[in-house]
Amino acid sequence: MCGIIGITSSNEVTTRIITSLKKLEYRGYDSAGIATLSNGYINEVKCEGRVEALEKNIIQTNISGSIGIGHVRWATHGRPSTINAHPHSSEAVSVVHNGIIENSTLLKKTLEKQGYKFKSQTDTEVIVHLVTCLLYTSDAADE
């Protein structure tokens, strides 16, 4: 079980995402994270533990943006840790996920053969690399 929030706005969203994660924390308190988009860059802050710890890290990093996602996690794949906390991001994609990706092992092996490196023990990271791969190899990426 996990809690997920996403907000897009013309205003800064970080505080609203943290407030929402506090309300969702009963759905997972092993780890928490947030990613925002600011000036075309994905900024990510994650931590093991509760949203309170995440909030302290966010204050130190001064993360901001008008588009953002947040996640509180109850571990299903991989132990509770900062590296396994969501979101998982590449330079182009940031993903939060609740559920189990049944074919993640097969997808991971395929992506590793293409040179993608995995940092976490989660199945969610497969989505990040798969979407990134498709963005950079698809004709749709040019549109």
Model-inferred region functions:
Residues 1-138:
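Conserved short alpha-helical segments that host acidic/polar catalytic motifs at enzyme active sites
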Residues 139-143:
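A short, hydrophobic C-terminal helix/tail in secreted or cell-surface proteins
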